[in-house]
């Protein structure tokens, strides 16, 4: 059955569909030995030979992994500074997976990894509004007015964050510490940290508690598990 080239590349885990479109337009993809730059191009998986930068792209089994990331690991496939990467925690995973979004080195909690470009796009693109839930421990105690700013949206650098759900879990005025529950559907670089800084708080610890309905329940820190078919469907159909 015919399939659009960019969709096939995304399904093979090359990148998100949007990024695959860019790769095609850049002339990096060939079909049966001929460079293709037209996005409407259709191919027949298993029959047509698809190459990216001269290397054949072969569809592999789609896998979806939930990792309980510890602090101290960078969210990347490889690191030029030779720091520990989350890939080192995936013992037994043979497929070539990539992180779905990013948690900085000092953030712990739920991180998804996959080789399914469509799944990655669904989770990471803001238009799909897949929720990401965090628990933040901060130096400084926010006022209700501060919390409302986070709920409405705060200006960070050159953009204003989308509305967020925010609840104060702990207020310790004596030690000047608080714990805040934050749920967003964006995923910009260090967004939650910057949101807290925007209202005068300093982040002591940050943990991602969930993505959509997924949590790290039953998964020890530094360990991982495969998502079930139902969990994948719930994400894709949300």
What are these regions (language model features)?
Residues 1-238:
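Basic, flexible Lys/Arg- and Gly-enriched helix-loop patches that mediate nucleic-acid binding at interfaces
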